[in-house]
From Swiss-Prot:
Disulfide bonds join C41-C109, C55-C63. It is a single-pass type I membrane protein. Residues 251-270, 313-332 are annotated as: Disordered. It comes from Rattus norvegicus. This is CMRF35-like molecule 1. The keyword DNA repair does not apply. The gene is Cd300lf. It comes from the Eukaryota. GO terms for cellular component: plasma membrane. Glycans are attached at N89. Residues 22-125 form the Ig-like V-type domain. The chain crosses the membrane at residues 182-202. Phosphorylated on tyrosine. Residues 1-18 form the signal peptide.
Amino acid sequence: MHLSLLALFLFWISGCFTAQDPVTGPEEVSGYEQGSLTVWCRYGSWWKDYSKYWCRGPKRSSCEIRVETDASERLVKENHVSIRDDQTNFTFTVTMEDLRMSDAGIYWCGITKAGYDHMFKVHVSINPVPTTPTTTSTTTIFTVTTTVKETSTLSTQTSHYSDNRYDSGGVGDGNGFLDLSVLLPVISAALLLLLLVVSLIAWRMVRRQKKAAGPPSGQADSVTHILCPPKPHVQPLEDDLCYANLSLQQPRTSPLKKGSSMSSSGKDHQEEVEYVTMAPFPREEISYAALSLASLGQEPTYSNTACLVTHGPRTNLGEETTEYSSIRRPMP
């Protein structure tokens, strides 16, 4: 009977210590798939030299130990579960990494001792990976803010650039206008080309007017004498033709001597060549006619007829019949 009472007393003492210093911790923890979670379990100071463990199972008597300390503060890791005992703060920490959906269930914080171990039940739940994590949302907000700032900066730079362009030349490239440095050479080249064309047209008009007005007043018409051989007592045919070569020359003597002086200088400065068809008269035989056009205001030029072509000073042609003709330029 005394032994029974002693055993009952010892059991009561053991129960008092157990109720007084149990292992405590969170009743429920959760984590995200592919993430990690940490569980802190506290114990009494007199249990610091005992081994601590983390086990899984619905019943405390049949749970499976996943990781256990060696009664020291050294970190112990098994697979993706680790445990470390902090004997100064009387806590041991359990960390589960690379969580899977299959890791959800009932776990226990335990201390190994004689008899029944001290244990505390912890329910672990695993949540699927969120579609938009919190960190991603924060990053998105930051990116939007940065974009707004950059846009404002670009707008300011664009306005400043446009103002500079307006101040420098008044022509901006934003609206499709040409730069002033390109526009000025183009305008100058166009004006130069227009001036060249106008000058060419004016020169051609002046040249035509001079050509239509005839030779200058200081020039005279030279005469070339052509002889048609006389045919005595023979009626001239209709097809007997004589040609006269007329050329313009500078005068060298007075108007009265033009007939001889101009005939002797037939080789100087010929400008125009004209052919004149002359037919003999049926009434009387005229060998040739000499035509001399003088400038306005000058005396008429007289020319003699001869039977030979003469280009030098006139000579005595004998007793042949001589006829003179006076021709003046009509008044305009």
